[in-house]
């Protein structure tokens, strides 16, 4: 098959990165799935450190009454810390680490394929993720910061009186770019799992980990466009004088909550289902046995994803 042969040639060519001196250009050009998986894990670790430092600051501030770190002149910084901690831990630590990192490293191995279907798209996804992190951090130093909470509920996120509009815009841009990265990674996993399986590997005999990523990718592709639409409506209310969520002029702020939690509730299972697959790998490898009840576990994860998206 011409496509598989081309992927093998690209994979062999990119595996030579280990013998070369690592530079920024080599990081940008690398399309090897193992290298990108390691980059995802390292990026998630760095992003997680920043989120952890913010949580430490919150705990120090709450250690006793009164102001300990946050100055009385900038009380909004506490709300900014809560917002950034939620964004960094959910969208930049757990999702890139479990889904992008372990997925890129192990999915082609379990499928018996040399690479993912679209290596360049895979590389583009992690570059977008890094850029989205910069946008989120930029919101911290832009004007007074976006202290909206990680849910970005209107009217707080659309009000000029309580926050900085440019900071909220940076937060929204960061989330939109992170969503694009997750959607591209999900499409890559879906096409790899369904089209680049080995001849002897069927969906019934496929291990739990590829199944977990297949289900997780399906939830991301279903829910992230809804969240992106809601965020664009908030951005339009904030900068384009639209009135989607302004109750004074006939808007409905509850409508945003419906749109957000169509993503927010499946997000809980998007974070945990890849961990189910990773635990199955660990148990199977340590015991040198096939997981008992493989089909039942696949059915359970599918029902979890369906019910989580409907509720």
Q: What residue spans do the PLM features occupy?
A:
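Membrane-embedded alpha-helical bundles that constitute the cytochrome b-like, heme-associated redox core
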Residues: 9, 19, 23-24, 53-67, ...
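Membrane-proximal N-terminal segments immediately preceding the first transmembrane helix
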Residues: 13-28, 107
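Single conserved hydrophobic/aromatic residue that forms the stacking wall/gate
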Residues: 1-8, 12
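Membrane-interfacial loop-to-helix junctions in multi-pass inner-membrane proteins
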Residues: 25-42, 111-131, 162-175, 194-220, ...
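Membrane-interfacial alpha-helical segments at the cytosolic side of multi-pass membrane proteins
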Residues: 91-103, 228, 270-286
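Hydrophobic alpha-helical membrane-insertion segments
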Residues: 43-53, 125-141, 215-233
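Membrane-interface helix-loop-helix modules in multi-pass inner-membrane proteins
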Residues: 59-190, 197-200, 234, 240-245, ...
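Membrane-embedded translocation segments of transport machinery
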Residues: 247-253, 259-268, 272-311
